[in-house]
Amino acid sequence: MTDPVSRLPGLAVIGGGPAGLMAAEAARAAGVEVDLFEAKGSVGRKFLIAGKGGLNLTHSEPMPGFAGRYGARADEVAGWLRDFGPEALRDWAHGLGVDSYVGSSGRVFPMDRKAAPLLRGWVRRLKDQGVRFHVLHRWLGWDDDGALHFATPEGERGVHATAAVLALGGGSWPQLGSDGGWVASLQARGLEVVPLQPANCGFDIGWSTHFAQRHAGAPIKPVVAHWFDSTGTGHALQGECVATATGIEGSLVYALSAALREAIARDGSAMLWLDLAPGRDLERLRRDLGRPRGGRSLSEHLRRQAGIDGAKAALVREALDATALADMDRIAATLKRLPLRLLRARPLDEAISSAGGVRLETLDDGLMAKALPGVFCAGEMLDWEAPTGGYLLTACFASGLRAGRSAARWLRQRAAGQGPGAAADH
C-alpha cells in the first residue's frame, strides 16, 4: 500500500516479534483480516538472535513453579499460560515441523537448536493464511486524525485500523527495533507505563585494573550465590557467572537481576556473597588449606589443596589484603563467602531484556487498554519480567495469543453492535 492514508478492513498488528506474530496468527484463525507492520526489513530479528547459541523455546519446569518465575506478575502471566503454556508451545512448534527436546538443564530446544527454520515455516504459514506483511514500517504513534502513523522508505503514511495489537518490544535491543520509542505515545493517551529498566543484565562492581585486564570474560563456576531480600530473608541459588571488565554477568546473575536492582534502588548498592567451593564445607577447606605449603606459591597451593584457580583465585586476591592472604583460615572463610558489592546495573541497551512497560492494571484481562478501546498490547512492552531459560519467549507467545484472540472477539462484538463503539483510531 502506498497511499498517504489508507483504511484497513480488520486488525493492524504492529511489531513482528513472537508476540506480534502470534497475535496475527490467533486473530487470523478467528477469521479476522490482519495486516502486520514491522519497522525492520524482516520480522523476527530478535528471535533469530535468541537462537544464535541454540533457541531456548521454553522450559520443562512444571506448574506452578513455572509461573512463579514471573515474580510479582506471576498471577497475571499464569492466566496467559493457561491458554498457551510450555506444552502447548512445543505442540505448536511440532505443527510447524519443528520437534523439540528437553536438555539436561530442563530447557527446551528445537532438535536442531536453530531459530531460522521455525521462523521461516511460521511466516510462510501466516502468509498462506492471508496475513499481509508490511516491512520497513516504523510506528510513530497516532496522527491528529487518529490514524496509525508510520515512517516508510517512501515517506510517512497514516493507516486507519478498526483495532490494533501493539507488540513493540521493550527497550533492550534498539538495533533490532526494541527501543522503547513507543512510551511517550502511549503515555499521552492515558496509559501508565512503568519506566523501562534492564533485566537479565550484568552489574558493575569496580574491579581492580589488574583483575579486569586479566580475567574479563572468565567463567566463575560452579558457585552458590547468597543474598537477602527486602524482608531480611536469606536466599541461595547455585549456578555460574562470568567476570566482565566492569563486574559480573551470566545466567546466575540474570536470575537475580530483579532482586539486585531493587536492592540497589533501595540501599544504593546490593550485596551478594559467592560460595566459590560449593563441594566442600568450611571445616574441610580449613583442613585442606592448612596442610603444609612448602615452597609452593599461594596460587599453586589453592589449586592443589582446594581446586581453586583462575578467576576464583583472583577473586580471593581482590577481597583480601596481603596480611589476610597469609591466613589460611581467612582464605577458607572467604572462599565460602566471598563478598561482592554491586554498584549498578549495566545500561538497558546491553541487557537481554527489559523490566517495566505498560502497567497491566491499565489493561483488561484481554490485554486491551481501558483508556483506548480497540488497542491491545502484548509481549515485552508489558510490565513483567522473567529470567532466561525459555520463560521470556513463552510469555511473549502466550500474551500475543491472548491479545490476538481478544482483538478478534472485540471486532466481532463491535460488528454485531455488542461492544463499545470506539475504534483503534485515537
Description of each model-found segment:
Residues A163-T209:
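Glycine-rich loop(s) and the adjacent beta-strand/alpha-helix scaffold that form part
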Residues V77-G85, S104-R124, W173-S178, I205-S208, ...:
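Short beta-strand to alpha-helix junction loop
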